[in-house]
Amino acid sequence: MKIKGENMKKLLLLIFITSGFIFAQTERHVMHVFYHMNVTNPAGVISALDKFHASDCGKKFPGDLGLMSETLNGASDSTHFIIASYMTREDFQNAGALTQSCPEAATMLGSLMNSASPVSDLAIVPIIEANDWTVDGAFTKYDMRMNLENEEEYAEAWSELMESNVKSGSVTSSYGLNRVLYGNDEFTHFVYIGASDFVTLTDGATELTSSKAFEKFSRKVKGMREVLNTSLVIPVKAWPRR
């Protein structure tokens, strides 16, 4: 969802009503919230989140936080996004109550406003989540529009493609399909493929798109979805829940 003329403080308060990655994932998250920003001072964003995480309020925060760099992202104004993840929907609610009542959250929000401006926000639910994405060092993300009625059939075809390429060695780490629950004015779903680093990621992508399994996948999903953008996402830092 595009943020047009809204107050940065209002937006960032929502970050903590709604929240991982680069933390070790021992359980699955039930939802993730992405807050896309145009960052002018990356070090300032990291510092603001560092201080909040170290505070008494941050120590009680029931979610995982991470900062991702959208290294290559087409024409979008977004340069980074904060990903906030929860193990339960109750954690989502509790985080909102906590951060609206603690002064450390207000301090952090003020610091973030000095280092970034909002671009868009969205909440997602995982449909497919294979392997531990929190340990990966690079991702290719494909944003797309798809009718909900085609989701199950697409998910089956995507899983078949991924499983085939895991066997061939071109997919070596995490992959997934996510549905946008809120903020789907631009895209309704996205898929991602992760790898340990950029070289491994791009080598695998070349092999995948030239495989017979990809040809079969393309035939199966023709007309089901429209790919709108492909982006390179690099993890920057994570602040795991205590």
Q: Where on the chain are the PLM-derived regions?
A:
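Sec-dependent N-terminal signal peptides
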Residues: 10-20
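Short, Lys/Arg-enriched N-terminal segments with co-localized hydrophobic residues
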Residues: 1-7
